[in-house]
A protein has these predicted regions:
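Catalytic phosphate/metal-binding cores of nucleic-acid and nucleotide-processing enzymes, i.e., regions
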Residues: 1-94
Length: 94
């Protein structure tokens, strides 16, 4: 089991926290597997003017962990590129 720390835009993170968004479309470059864990770092969509690169804001939010429940990959006949996967995720309860 691995722990993956992923970047996520604020608008998607809010939906994940509310349980409205229970999946993630990701580039399949980390060998995701069922049972792996995910945490998220929220990124700003618009970096501050003084920065050229993507800016990661440190939010004082609870450290929340999600478990990968399902990995959908290798189905180009349904329009999912071979380099991407869809992760079914569920928040771990404390």
């Amino acid at each position: 089991m691995k722990l993956h720390e992923l970047k996520i835009k604020r608008k998607y993170y809010d939906d994940v926290l509310r349980g409205k968004k229970t999946f993630e479309l990701r580039k399949n470059d980390r060998d995701y597997r069922e049972g792996d864990l995910i945490t998220f770092k929220v990124i700003d969509e618009e970096p501050p003017k003084e920065f050229n690169d993507c800016f990661i804001r440190a939010f004082k939010e609870p450290y929340i962990v999600f478990r990968i429940m399902y990995v959908l990959k290798d189905v180009p006949e349904y329009g999912l590129d071979k380099d991407y996967c869809i992760l079914g995720i569920r928040q771990l309860k404390e």
